[in-house]
């Protein structure tokens, strides 16, 4: 599916906010701005700036998901609510997770429209063209000091997720900073939520910088999958997207050693990968290619990752040091390291 857009606002009966839905393949991003000073969205923007408020999850039964998670200790964001139009009805409910981030459960089995009630098709003057992005691979949250295990337990006990992978400060560190991370996943592995917390280091880590500028815990980055990262990144760069700086040339010379047996199946040209500053890593199941944007708003908070998996199930552990050194170079420019 190519890029499409939808609009919801005053003309569609929504009186307190305006929203634009940006879609490509299985990706749906809803960009919302408040229309009134008293809107709770304004409170969120004043404290956090632009960022992710709602992480929506598709469920078979939004009522059951809500009541079960509340019974297990979740804090309510919205009780089950039915919204309808000529295409049917959507049931939504929601709970809070870390910080002021919420999970909204969306039940769409009785809805035949393209998105949700309250939205109409929007034709963009920018004439957008698809860039090969497919779906959200994972979404990473940053939490405060010594809070990671609390939220790991939340996802285990309340959401029924499992701890898929764990990384400590011995694995994720540079000369100056460190962090710890645990990856939570649902039963089929389709949903993956890594949770990061700061660790002791000589200087301020990227997690501490995020917490300071975002005003607390929140979504650090959204990883979006592609089947052809070279084409996708080339198109994004041509349209002005800025990515983190490339690792040193020694990094790319070591790719055959890093990939080991998987080097035989690698089709991508290493020179082109280096030209685009794409990073490569491997695990026992295959290899992956990934690259990270700079923050997409004025505050150094939310950014995006583009990832192509060639069998690998991990998160590029072999790239952690090179990635975080690149982030630290950006922090040094901002004077926040």
Regions found by a protein language model. Give the residues of each.
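Core segments of cupin and vicinal oxygen chelate
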Residues: 1-28, 71, 80-86, 93-96, ...
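Short beta->alpha transition motifs characteristic of CBS
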Residues: 105-111, 197-199, 307-311
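TerminUS-proximal long segments
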Residues: 290, 299-337
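N-terminal beta-strand motif that seeds the catalytic metal site of vicinal oxygen chelate
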Residues: 52-55, 112-152, 162, 215-224, ...
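Long compositionally biased, domain-poor regions of proteins
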Residues: 191-193, 215-296, 302-309
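An N-terminus-focused feature that recognizes amino-terminal "leader" regions
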Residues: 1-121, 138, 145, 149, ...
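Short, structured motif recognition centered on aromatic/hydrophobic residues
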Residues: 22, 29-31, 41, 51-55, ...
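Active-site-adjacent "gating/activation" loops or surface patches in catalytic cores
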Residues: 188-209
